């Protein structure tokens, strides 16, 4: 069965289209009007091993918040839909990823229970047109709409670009492990029988 999803989200603030294939090859393309955020979404696809297409038109004349938030919500929804009943998945994943001086640890549980723990040094500023304070909100939005538990911990880093990018790469690698199919898992990996 194909583990894919196509999610379209329309509000008065944005129009988002996400296409996701969990069993892809890491082909990723993002066009949101926020170049650094495009780069981050492409990191999720590439390092998650997902085929991912992101197309967002948002009210950038105000700022990037709605565009970024709605894209994250739609991505989380696509992740949840592509996982289906979660039969045969590994469920858990973790990764520690360096990017020069930055080091980030992420862990994910595809539990069906949304919970986000995000620990980073206070980063207030812009990377291009990307507001660094949105990073936590992106992961909170993905977590809520995907219904997953996600921990992201920045262990070190000074350069804002490196700190944010290492977070996306680390989350992607953790998700890659969690969504992977495991031939030893019969059914859903939970003693409850459902995730």
From Swiss-Prot:
What Enzyme Commission number(s) does the record list for this chain? 4.2.1.19
Q: Which PROSITE patterns match?
A: IGP_DEHYDRATASE_1 (PS00954), IGP_DEHYDRATASE_2 (PS00955)
Provide any one GO MF term from the record.
imidazoleglycerol-phosphate dehydratase activity
What InterPro entries does this protein map onto?
A: IGPD_sf (IPR038494), ImidazoleglycerolP_deHydtase (IPR000807), ImidazoleglycerP_deHydtase_CS (IPR020565), Ribosomal_Su5_D2-typ_SF (IPR020568)
The Gene Ontology CC terms held by the record are: cytoplasm
Coiled-coil stretches are none
Q: Does the keyword Lyase apply?
A: yes
State the pathway, as annotated in the record. Amino-acid biosynthesis; L-histidine biosynthesis; L-histidine from 5-phospho-alpha-D-ribose 1-diphosphate: step 6/9
| Keyword Lyase (UniProt) | yes
Q: Which reaction does it catalyse?
A: D-erythro-1-(imidazol-4-yl)glycerol 3-phosphate = 3-(imidazol-4-yl)-2-oxopropyl phosphate + H2O
- Which Pfam family, an example, fits this chain? IGPD
Q: Which domain of life is it from?
A: Bacteria
Q: Where in the cell is it found?
A: Cytoplasm
Enzyme class, spelled out: lyase
Q: Which UniProt keywords apply?
A: Amino-acid biosynthesis, Cytoplasm, Histidine biosynthesis, Lyase
UniProt record, GO biological process: L-histidine biosynthetic process
> To which protein family does this belong?
Belongs to the imidazoleglycerol-phosphate dehydratase family.
Stored NCBIfam families: PRK00951.1-6, PRK00951.2-1, PRK00951.2-4
Protein name (Swiss-Prot/TrEMBL): Imidazoleglycerol-phosphate dehydratase
Q: Provide the gene name from the record.
A: hisB
């Amino acid at each position: 069965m194909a583990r894919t999803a196509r999610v379209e989200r329309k509000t008065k603030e944005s129009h988002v289209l996400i296409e996701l294939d969990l069993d892809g090859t890491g082909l990723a393309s993002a066009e949101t009007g926020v170049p650094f955020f495009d780069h981050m979404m492409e990191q999720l696809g590439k390092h998650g091993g997902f085929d991912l297409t992101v197309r967002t038109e948002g009210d950038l004349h105000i700022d990037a918040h709605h565009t970024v938030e709605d894209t994250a919500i739609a991505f989380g929804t696509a992740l949840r839909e592509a996982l289906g009943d979660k039969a045969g998945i590994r469920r858990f994943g973790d990764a520690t990823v360096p990017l020069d001086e930055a080091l980030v640890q992420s862990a994910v549980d595809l539990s069906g229970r949304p919970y986000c723990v995000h620990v980073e040094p206070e980063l207030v500023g812009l990377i291009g047109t990307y507001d660094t304070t949105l990073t936590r909100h992106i992961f909170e939005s993905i977590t809520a709409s995907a219904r997953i538990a996600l921990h992201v911990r920045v262990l070190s880093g000074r350069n804002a670009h490196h700190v944010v990018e290492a977070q996306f790469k680390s989350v992607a690698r953790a998700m890659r492990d969690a969504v992977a199919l495991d031939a030893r898992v019969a059914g859903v990996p939970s003693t409850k029988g459902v995730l």
